[in-house]
Design a protein with these regions (language model features):
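A cross-family signal for N-terminal binding/gating loops and helix N-caps
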Residues: 1-126, 131
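Basic, nucleic-acid-binding surfaces and adjacent catalytic neighborhoods in DNA/RNA-processing proteins
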Residues: 22-41, 54, 88, 164-225
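Phosphate/anion-contacting hairpin/loop surfaces
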Residues: 70-187, 193-194, 198-200
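Generic detection of long, well-ordered alpha-helical segments
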Residues: 1-4, 105, 155, 159, ...
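Short clusters of hydrophobic/aromatic residues that line enzyme substrate/ligand-binding pockets
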Residues: 45, 148-151, 203, 212
Length: 225
């Protein structure tokens, strides 16, 4: 499953080709993703301009000019395949974070949602296992959305510190590695980076969370960041 750094790379690639541009057309080829694609998906996004492509934890967050927000998750196997009029060569594709050049014929049967953006760019959401999702909300309800409201602090945020981490670990009875995977403790950390962070901080993955205080918490917060 893509973790926070990989999702951030995808976000940057999408921002490069989508921000400030109009959604000309959308093809929803399958509605039955992990959460069904809303029936009014096309109606709400077609003709709208993407103002900002953001991220919250492992979710991509697209903010549109009318206040609509697109929430997307890559699941286990999801990819955003970017096709611009001139990116089918290795040289031009290297300008987009993530190197999104591809042969579209290899992925067509798994491309469930396709965005046609102004200037001829096409973004294809490919997800063979269909554990990903795309759904809609709006600015007023974003923070309280069921997929967002439980999330802990961003590990790259200035408010994520050792004392904050230590406080959020209190009361956890699972080993520290499992606690780090709890998105309510810190958002976006997955299996790979939990292991790496614990190793960098010199902590056993079996340690009890309540013992991660003081300098231990400071080291772990720094490693997670």
């Amino acid at each position: 499953m893509p973790e926070l750094p990989e999702v951030e790379t995808v976000r940057r690639g999408l921002a490069e080709v989508m921000e400030g541009r109009r959604i000309e057309r959308i093809e929803v080829r399958r509605h039955d993703l992990r959460i069904p694609v809303p029936d009014d998906f096309n109606e709400r996004l077609q003709g709208r301009t993407l103002e900002k492509m953001g991220r919250r934890a492992k979710y991509l967050v697209g903010e549109f000019d009318d206040g609509t927000i697109l929430l997307a998750h890559l699941g286990m196997s999801g990819r955003m395949i970017i096709e611009t009029p001139d990116n089918m060569t290795e040289k031009s594709a290297s300008n987009i974070p993530g190197d999104f050049a591809h042969d579209p014929g290899n992925h067509a049967k798994h491309e469930h949602i396709v965005f046609h953006v102004g200037n001829g760019t096409v973004i294809r959401f490919s997800d063979p296992r269909r554990f990903g999702l795309m759904t809609l909300t709006d600015r007023e309800n974003f923070a309280d959305h069921k997929l967002i409201r439980h999330l802990g602090p961003e590990p790259t945020g200035e408010d994520f510190t050792g004392p904050v981490l230590a406080a959020r670990l209190q009361g956890k009875r699972t080993p520290i590695k499992a606690a780090l995977l709890d998105q309510r403790v810190v958002a976006g950390v997955g299996n790979i980076y939990a292991c790496e962070a614990l190793f960098a901080a010199g902590l056993s993955p079996l340690r009890q969370p309540a013992t991660v205080q003081g300098r231990r918490a400071d080291r772990l917060a720094m490693a997670v960041r």
